[in-house]
């Protein structure tokens, strides 16, 4: 078990040096750090597999909160896309007690991602007077869960009525699954509307676009992380988009992890980057709808890759786009962009933005 603890201690140091696809300039140190982070995550996944068994690896992601405790024998998994909370344990003694404790802490955890290490088994989850999941989950009587007494009673109900077990050949896994309320996505989005409106006014970016990016990137999960270390609600990367924004604001260095895990700071930085894409990197595109399609795609795959779809010369690329209808630009980006992820990304964000415009 010592090697798992050592990995957990090393993880935060390596994670802070990583980055992802969003941003502009090539950075050799970033490439090395990204490779190191990939190696670390591979080791972390391998260690979880050793403990839990084959095909039982679950790791935190942009839309998945996963926290291990009890020497990695118990885990809480919130799937923000599916709207499910699954608490599991492989503890050989008193598994119900391990599940009960994890259920209560998960239901009552706060919304400060910087205080929780998702890459260790340290029990650093604090019970909050304003639980992050309040209103997104109701108990067996249909009531939202704010206090420890109600959470404890619900945990007892779940263990009595919904406890399941399965064997993977190596371990017996005990689990309880909780369904979130049907409109859990809207409940989370509502938490951040004030911050979105403030950033929208500050940078001149449409609220509906900010919300659509947040939904697509993280499903409004403030704990969002990625294998390439994009952080927070808008999946901002310290050493690429974060650095670009800081430079444009006259700041040196890069935003810290704690800065990007703060929802207001994350939304401000992500929106500032959208404004940079719109006004600077892709400002040569005249039609606002065509430029919006380019900005959305660039937020995922970079402005350079967007322009290269049309021409290797940036100025010529903008000129070509300016001769096309917005529909043709959309069609081109969703069919000819070299990245399948970026092609899907434009479709997802554009669809989500339409729904927010109707509200």
Curated annotation (Swiss-Prot):
Lipidation (S-diacylglycerol cysteine): 17
InterPro entries named among the record's database cross-references: Lysozyme-like_dom_sf (IPR023346), Murein_transglycosylaseC (IPR023664), Murein_transglycosylaseC_N (IPR024570), Transglyc_AS (IPR000189), Transglycosylase_SLT_dom_1 (IPR008258)
Subcellular location: Cell outer membrane
Residues linked to a lipid group, N-palmitoyl cysteine type: 17
One GO molecular-function entry: peptidoglycan lytic transglycosylase activity
Pfam families reported in the protein's UniProt record: Mltc_N, SLT
Signal peptide: 1-16
Bilayer-spanning residue ranges: none
A single cellular component GO annotation: cell outer membrane
Top-rank taxon: Bacteria
EC number per UniProt: 4.2.2.n1
Main location: membrane
Broad enzyme group: lyase
Keywords: Cell outer membrane, Cell wall biogenesis/degradation, Lipoprotein, Lyase, Membrane, Palmitate, Signal
UniProt record, GO biological process: cell wall macromolecule catabolic process; cell wall organization; peptidoglycan metabolic process
Membrane-topology descriptor: Lipid-anchor
Catalytic activity: Exolytic cleavage of the (1->4)-beta-glycosidic linkage between N-acetylmuramic acid (MurNAc) and N-acetylglucosamine (GlcNAc) residues in peptidoglycan, from either the reducing or the non-reducing ends of the peptidoglycan chains, with concomitant formation of a 1,6-anhydrobond in the MurNAc residue
Function according to Swiss-Prot or TrEMBL: Murein-degrading enzyme. May play a role in recycling of muropeptides during cell elongation and/or cell division.
Family classification: Belongs to the transglycosylase Slt family.
Xref: NCBIfam families: PRK11671.1
Name of the protein this chain belongs to: Membrane-bound lytic murein transglycosylase C
Organism: Escherichia coli O157:H7
Gene: mltC
